[in-house]
Structures are given as structure tokens and as C-alpha cells.
Amino acid sequence: MKPTRVPKNPCFSSGPCAKHPGYSIEDLNDAPFGRSHRSKPGKEKLAEAIKRTRDMLGLPSDYLVGIVPASDTGAFEMCLWSMLGCRGVDVLVWESFSKEWATDITKQLKLKDTRVFEAEYGKLPDLENVDFKNDVVFVWNGTTSGVKVPNGDWIPDSREGLTLCDATSAVFAMDIPYHKLDVLTFSWQKVLGGEGAHGMLILSPRAVQRLESYTPAWPLPKIFRLTKGGKLNKEIFEGSTINTPSMLANEDWLATLKWAESVGGLKQLIQRTNENLAVFEAFVAKNNWIHFLAETKEIRSSTSVCFKVDLSEEKLKELIKMLENEKVAYDIGSYRDAPSGLRIWCGATIEKEDLECLCEWIEWAYDLVK
């Protein structure tokens, strides 16, 4: 029987992700429109975004946070190009974005002393093979495969190389041991549903030391430069961005952080995300035609949740189109490079009731197209 209720918000995209419940464009009226980002009010707004982010995540006091251009991609690229090359590199690959980082390191930077550990979709490489005398590059959560690292236990507290982690679909949704990460990047448009084009960069003291003691052999474009005269450009981490940010997008980020504070902060964001995943765990347990792409529960993502469905690719496309036409689910097809299936965002801005409702519609559509 066709469901009678529909999700209040049918946006289940894995990026840009759904706006938080109660979102209003009116919340952005305090943005310093028409003012320079280097003016006092402009810089204060950017510094506020940095401080609220730091406080929400509970970062170590000696870690630095900055706003940088070009989303998570820009943030991570600037670190790869600025920091790698002075020692060997181990890269972990198990989905599209981690594969792109490996391509950058081996084909663009052409670092010969590089080991790539690759696993197919749904699996993780063997983490025990990683050598922390090398710099280690990995994603915390594979956004296109629905597979995450189980925890940080495989990373030693004492290590010679740096750990560079793309955590864009993990921050604000998963427990992350920051002291095990030297570089951590993310974008605004993932777990908290902010706007695109801006990245955030978090550096440990060890990462700063690398920047100040090592100069790559290749030229760096302006938007990748984190140092001036061999010293860290600390102004970047105080609200003085490398180039012009969108003050509207920054105001939107402030609004999302205020919402996150209002629902109980980081602990509650993680709980909301886990409760959302539990909806699908119950749904998969009840239906033998839908399966998690992640092979085991301990590596199953709680944000970008990926599924295999017992349908042909043609029938699956029909199911996805049907749900879109009914205006109950947008953008839930698997990533273009991933195995055919569904990918449904379960981060903190998604309401559990909407996912429960979506499950009814998926079941209805499956019965029609199978």
C-alpha cells in the first residue's frame, strides 16, 4: 500500500546536505553585506566562526583552526602539496575521494616513496600494514562507500610521520581522537548542512613544525601557501583568510553552529546521527533484498550510508526516479564511481522520523519495480 505520510524534508543528499530543522534565511540578516572581509566586522565574523567551530569540536588548545578556499578539497590539497615529500607516504584507499588523494600523490606530486593500500568498495585496507614512520594519508569516513575507520586505536600516539585525515563526512557525527591526527580537514556543507566552497583546516603543533621546517621542491600557488618567510601565517587561523570568502556562507555556518549548540552540542549531534543509522539497521534486518555496502558493523558509516539493493541497475534507477517524482527523496543514488545502489545521508540535520517515513516509501517503490 502506498504510504500516506511523507518526509518533512526530502533532502537526503550526501553533500550539500540538508539544512538543519527550523532553518530560516532570516537567520542570515546579520551578515556584514558589502563590507570587506578584512574590515573589523568582517574579520570578527570569521574569527567567531573559527572559535565556535573549535569550541564545538572540543579541539586540543594547541591545535589551530582556519577557513580556507575550495571546500574540503582545497583544504586537503593545500596540505598534501605543502607538507608531503620529505619522507615516505602511506595512502589508504577504499572509495573515490581517497583514490583521488592517492592519484594526486603518485601522478601529480609524483612522490616515488609512496605505498598505496587499496581495498574494494565495502571493505577497508589492512590498517596493521601502515608504517607510521611515513606520512599517512586517509579519509576517516569514505563518503562514497559508506565505510569508515572503526576508531583511532590503529594510530600510535607517538609517531614519526604526520597523519593527514580528510574527515569531511565524519566531523560533528563521529568520535574522533584529535590527538592522533596532525591534519584534519572538512567542509561546511556536510554534517551541519552549511554552504559549499569553504574548507576548514585543523593543524596540530607537529603539522606546524613540518610547515616551518620543510619547503617542497615544487612551486605552490597563492591559495596553497600557509607560510610567510618560512613561518606559519598565523593570521589565517585568526580570521584573515587567504582570499575573499563569502560572508553570507560564513553567516550560514554561524547559524548552523548555533543550532548545533541549541540541540546539545557535539555529543547530541553524534547521538542524533547514530539514532538515524539505527533506523536503517532495523530496516535492513527486516528486509532481505537490501544490504549495507559496508561488510561489517564496525566499519559502517553513520553519515553517508550506502546500500546494495537486489534490483538490476535499470530497476534501481526506476525506484530512485519514482521516489523523486513523489517528492519524498532527492539525490539518493550511489556515487557515480561506486557500485550501483542507494546512498542516503543520515547526519545530524536529518530527522529520525523522516528516515522512518522514507523506509516505508523505499519498500513501496521496491515492491512496484521488482
From Swiss-Prot:
**So which cofactors does this thing need?**
pyridoxal 5'-phosphate
Per the record, the GO terms for biological process are: L-serine biosynthetic process; pyridoxine biosynthetic process
Name the InterPro entries for this protein. Pser_aminoTfrase (IPR022278), Pser_aminoTfrase_methanosarc (IPR006271), PyrdxlP-dep_Trfase (IPR015424), PyrdxlP-dep_Trfase_major (IPR015421), PyrdxlP-dep_Trfase_small (IPR015422)
Chain sites annotated for binding L-glutamate: 38
Q: Where in the cell is it found?
A: Cytoplasm
List N6-(pyridoxal phosphate)lysine occurrences by residue: 190
Binding-site list for pyridoxal 5'-phosphate: 101, 143, 166, 189, 243-244
Pathway, per record:
Amino-acid biosynthesis; L-serine biosynthesis; L-serine from 3-phospho-D-glycerate: step 2/3; Cofactor biosynthesis; pyridoxine 5'-phosphate biosynthesis; pyridoxine 5'-phosphate from D-erythrose 4-phosphate: step 3/5
One GO cellular component assignment for this chain's record is: cytoplasm
Q: Return the Gene3D superfamilies for the record.
A: Aspartate Aminotransferase, domain 1 (3.90.1150.10), Type I PLP-dependent aspartate aminotransferase-like (Major domain) (3.40.640.10)
Q: Keywords on this record? A: Amino-acid biosynthesis, Aminotransferase, Cytoplasm, Pyridoxal phosphate, Pyridoxine biosynthesis, Serine biosynthesis, Transferase
User: What note does UniProt attach to the cofactor annotation?
Assistant: Binds 1 pyridoxal phosphate per subunit.
| Catalytic activity, EC | 2.6.1.52
Predominant location of this chain? cytoplasm
| HAMAP family reported in the protein's UniProt record | SerC_aminotrans_5
**Could you describe the subunit structure of this protein?**
Homodimer.
* Physiological role: Catalyzes the reversible conversion of 3-phosphohydroxypyruvate to phosphoserine and of 3-hydroxy-2-oxo-4-phosphonooxybutanoate to phosphohydroxythreonine.
As for family, the record states: Belongs to the class-V pyridoxal-phosphate-dependent aminotransferase family. SerC subfamily.
What is the protein name given in its UniProt record?
Phosphoserine aminotransferase
What is the scientific name of the source organism? Methanosarcina mazei (strain ATCC BAA-159 / DSM 3647 / Goe1 / Go1 / JCM 11833 / OCM 88)
Task: Provide the gene name from the record.
Answer: serC
